[in-house]
């Protein structure tokens, strides 16, 4: 893990309120480094300083944000005007707010991998690279596995203890 000893946040704040949501963001790593836009898992998760451990913080500028209704982002109504398209647009608004014009690496895991792929599809001109882990595509079969079949892992594991 590259960032383990150097995952200090150098900038944090909120995007200006839009549609009743204030989006929390933070940046870590090299302020002049290659920009990486990180999408956390969930839905309902949040960005954590430990997510910096996935990156080379001496060379990369890692931008993280708490999605609408998550973590330190603020809203009166976490459901209203909170959908996948808006989450992707919020990510683009964040890059604009931070004056990041060059293509970025998008990264994410689980639900974050879904959002990273949707971001790349919506804004292909903004993409330098895509880095995904624990990929979740939010297809019907993925939902069925998550809600029903994933329990098989626990049953199998318990049988071997």
Language-model segments: what does each one mean?
Residues 2-22:
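N-terminal cap/lid segment of alpha/beta-hydrolase-fold proteins
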Residues 74-88, 141-149:
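Catalytic nucleophile-loop/oxyanion-hole region of alpha/beta-hydrolase
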Residues 86-104:
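Conserved acidic catalytic loop of the alpha/beta-hydrolase fold
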Residues 17-75:
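Conserved HGGG/HGGXW glycine-rich cap/lid loop of the alpha/beta-hydrolase fold
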Residues 113-124:
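Short glycine-enriched nucleophile-adjacent loop
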Residues 127-158:
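A catalytic-pocket lid/entrance helix-loop region that shapes and gates access to the active site
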């Amino acid at each position: 893990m590259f960032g383990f000893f150097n995952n200090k946040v150098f900038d944090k704040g909120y995007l200006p309120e839009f549609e009743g949501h204030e989006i929390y963001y933070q940046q870590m790593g090299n302020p002049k480094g290659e920009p990486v836009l990180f999408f956390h898992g969930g839905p309902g998760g949040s960005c954590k300083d430990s997510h910096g451990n996935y990156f080379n913080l001496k060379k990369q500028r890692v931008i993280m944000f708490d999605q609408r209704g998550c973590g330190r982002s603020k809203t009166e109504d976490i459901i209203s005007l909170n959908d996948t398209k808006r989450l992707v647009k919020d990510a683009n608004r964040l890059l604009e707010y931070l004056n990041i014009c060059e293509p970025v690496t998008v990264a994410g895991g689980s639900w974050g991998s879904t959002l990273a792929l949707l971001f790349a599809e919506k804004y292909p001109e903004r993409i330098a690279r895509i880095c995904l882990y624990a990929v979740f595509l939010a297809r019907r079969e993925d939902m069925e596995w998550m809600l029903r079949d994933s329990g098989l892992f626990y049953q199998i594991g318990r049988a071997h203890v």
